[in-house]
Amino acid sequence: MNIAIAGASGRMGRMLIEHILATEGVSLSGALDLPGSPALGQDAGLLLGRQTGVAITADLEAGLAGADCLIDFTRPEGTLAHLAVAKRLGVKMVIGTTGFDDAGKAALAEAAKSIGIVFAANMSVGVNATFKLLEVAAKLLSTGYDIEIIEAHHRFKVDAPSGTALKMGEVVAEALGRDLKTCAVYAREGHTGERDPNSIGFATVRGGDIVGDHTVMFAGIGERIEISHKSSSRQSYADGAVRAARFLADKPNGLFDMQDVLGLK
């Protein structure tokens, strides 16, 4: 399978390229970056200390030529621009970008009628196993427990709460028969009054080089259950993304997530 990478000079892009080069059955066919990036024209493996024969380009059509799938961990506006070209060229997509609004998500769903797309807030196998644990816990602890979600990421992350934290909230809310849009509390300040027992709270930490920590707390009277996932590197995201790309090999179209990829549905 031929795979192109968006954001090729970024932290996640470099990790994806390294993982593809080390994985049998897949090859790097294209590397995309923003216009004006100092990496344009360089070999995609330069920062990894090796040659790939693939030059980083801002030309979407050139970067996607010969690609079966594009892996994209960029920003919503960039991903949507890539999506339009990928759809036209028939290139499938694995999307790990977070921060989409409802219109952006609708655009992904529409494009998935024509091409196969895996869209997931987190590609880690461990995180997706955590989602299943949360579903079970929420059903067992449906009454008498207050639910709070705490997430921490590096200082460079631009959206909050994280897409993974929001997905955790959606999993818990769905298991409880609630709508996260109406029960989520994203900030508390001043005299807030007593906690609404049906609410799901979020707390966000940003600092340093934290790759990604997530904890869901079920706080009852006399006990507290915490389900946590902590990432120590982006390797697990890269592994999951390449796994998702291979999953799409025989999928002509459709919108999938990592639960589909891992057979957890």
Swiss-Prot record:
Disulfide bonds listed in the record: none
Protein localization: Cytoplasm
Positions annotated to bind NAD(+): 7-12, 33, 96-98, 120-123
Any one annotated GO CC term: cytosol
InterPro entries: DapB_C, DapB_N, DapB_N_CS, DHDPR_bac, NAD(P)-bd_dom_sf
Involved pathway(s): Amino-acid biosynthesis; L-lysine biosynthesis via DAP pathway; (S)-tetrahydrodipicolinate from L-aspartate: step 4/4
Flavoprotein found in the keyword field: no
EC primary class: oxidoreductase
Catalyzed reaction equations: (S)-2,3,4,5-tetrahydrodipicolinate + NAD(+) + H2O = (2S,4S)-4-hydroxy-2,3,4,5-tetrahydrodipicolinate + NADH + H(+); (S)-2,3,4,5-tetrahydrodipicolinate + NADP(+) + H2O = (2S,4S)-4-hydroxy-2,3,4,5-tetrahydrodipicolinate + NADPH + H(+)
Catalytic residues identified in the record: 153 (proton donor/acceptor), 157 (proton donor)
GO molecular function: 4-hydroxy-tetrahydrodipicolinate reductase; NAD binding; NADP binding; oxidoreductase activity, acting on CH or CH2 groups, NAD or NADP as acceptor
A Pfam family per the record: DapB_N
Presence of the UniProt keyword NADP in the record: yes
A GO BP annotation: diaminopimelate biosynthetic process
E.C. designation(s): 1.17.1.8
Entry-linked PROSITE patterns: DAPB (PS01298)
Keyword terms: Amino-acid biosynthesis, Cytoplasm, Diaminopimelate biosynthesis, Lysine biosynthesis, NAD, NADP, Oxidoreductase
Binding site for (S)-2,3,4,5-tetrahydrodipicolinate: 154, 163-164
Family classification: Belongs to the DapB family.
Alphabetical list of NCBIfam families matching this protein: dapB
Known role: Catalyzes the conversion of 4-hydroxy-tetrahydrodipicolinate (HTPA) to tetrahydrodipicolinate.
Protein name, per record: 4-hydroxy-tetrahydrodipicolinate reductase
Organism: Cupriavidus pinatubonensis (strain JMP 134 / LMG 1197) (Cupriavidus necator (strain JMP 134))
Encoding gene (name): dapB
